[in-house]
Amino acid sequence: MFNNKLFRRPLSAMAFMAAILVSATTISCTKDDDDKDNDVVEAETFSGKLTVNFKGSDFTTDNITVRVSDVVFSNSDKTQGTLSLNFEKVKFVPQMPVSLDITVPGVAFKIISKNKAEISGNGIVPLTGGKGYEMYAVTGLTGEITDENDSSRSDDSISFSLKFGDYPTSYSGVEAD
């Protein structure tokens, strides 16, 4: 005769050990994935202040929307890549007859800490309506994106400075609601 009690106990112990092994593997994989998961640079919308120096005078406009889009990581550990900065309905100076949507593509980024990335660019031709404007090529773009990751509040921010052609420009914004 076959004694079921004899085989039941070792199988239960084996099933228990297998469950522990699967759990440990899952936790281990999750931790590794979290280490590589970097959401400092992601598609995000900011609202802030744009300042343009035109003919020696600063023109500042509040509530300007800048979207980060087209985020592409260039390495497997997701610490650097390119993104686009999209200025929405912006007038750089009061004399501009219409507001424009302007995209600055191919902005380089490098994640320097868990919650901060540096952005940079030089010689980037901005686009509006799909057309490039070489006379306003972006030079000297430097700045940073921060992601505080605090669930009680939103402290994500972006700040940068650049030149559109001969016009020094700066932007500082926080994550839009």
For the regions a language model picked out, list residue spans one by one.
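Conserved long hydrophobic alpha-helices within structured protein cores
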Residues: 14, 41-47, 115-117
